Amino acid sequence: GPEYTTAENSQPSGGFIACPQSMRAFTTADVSSTTVPAWVESYLSGLNAEGATYHDIGMIWGARMASKRGIMAANVNDQPYRSASRHLIFMTDGALQPNRYAAGNYGIEIFANRIAPQYTNDLDLIPYHSARFRAACDAAKNEDLVVWMVAFGTAITDDMRYCATGDRVYFASDTTQLRAQFRTIASQIASLRLGQ
């Protein structure tokens, strides 16, 4: 398979150079409906589990996309005269699973040393990424985002409970339950919208 090489090391990459599904810019959704929009169904169907799950980078990008001050501000603030609640739905299909040999947003962890000290093992990387995840969750909530957590086929963790706004934490063991949970979330957002 492919390899990566540095002056000090060469390592077969195996499945550690995954290209995740690209983010999707905000799209207008019918908040009066309890059905999951077709574009969400299609997007979710295209997701593939590759391992090396990083909750922190997912939350960082979710918050960046929804921030009124962030790189997507023009999209977020396109109708400033409307008082819209903003919701971030964070779904994961795996427990936090950093891998020091995985190519990620900040390079290959064992060589880049941007998250933890060099040669930190996979298990010892978890507290670093957990702390970053919680900090990203705090930042998202400080941006007045309502954070919903969905655990798909994986256990709900203390980090997920910490991150969610209130008790907005959901579990789904299969796609039928996942669709049901998204319908529940959609109906609650619609109720919030109608009540404001």
Feature names for model-found ranges:
Residues 1-196:
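P/S/T/G-enriched low-complexity
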